[in-house]
């Protein structure tokens, strides 16, 4: 009887993680997503805020969220918890189709390596800078500086 239950559980898990499986996911911005009711903040990166534009008008925040959505689309999504942030979000390494979303976002120039917390994506950022991709091409202010400036407006 226990073997039957184990086989059934494995079959159900396979269906949940199968490509094209039905699960609820929403992109909040370029480094935050919601999967089946859990909010995940991508580990080791900081993407432009949703309303953040670069000095040349490039809509960095909107494009970062759109890029993250394109990376996820059509792939099974799995998140591995690393920590919880001060807002109660689960900080995690999330993979779509086996690819680390944080690494891809930084490598493609849609986020910065958040060196304050991790050096995991420093190499991807160096490559994006060298190739002048995304935020590096448009002279965007790092998201942590942009947030600080925005908060100061209301103090």
Residue ranges and their predicted role:
Residues 2-7, 14-155:
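Small beta-barrel nucleic-acid-binding modules, primarily SNase/OB-fold domains
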């Amino acid at each position: 009887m226990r073997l039957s239950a184990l086989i059934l559980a494995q079959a159900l898990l396979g269906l949940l993680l199968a490509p094209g499986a039905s699960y609820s996911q929403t992109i909040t911005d370029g480094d935050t997503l919601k999967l089946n009711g859990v909010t995940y903040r991508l580990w080791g990166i900081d993407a432009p805020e949703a309303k953040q534009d670069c000095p040349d008008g490039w809509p960095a925040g909107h494009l970062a969220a759109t890029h993250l959505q394109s990376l996820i689309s059509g792939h099974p999504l799995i998140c591995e918890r690393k920590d919880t942030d001060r807002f109660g979000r689960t900080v995690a390494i999330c993979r779509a189709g086996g690819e680390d979303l944080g690494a891809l976002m930084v490598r493609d120039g849609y986020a910065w390596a958040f060196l304050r917390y991790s050096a995991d994506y420093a190499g991807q950022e160096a490559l994006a800078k060298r190739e002048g991709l995304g935020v590096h091409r448009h002279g965007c202010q790092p998201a942590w500086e942009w947030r600080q400036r925005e908060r100061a407006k209301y103090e």
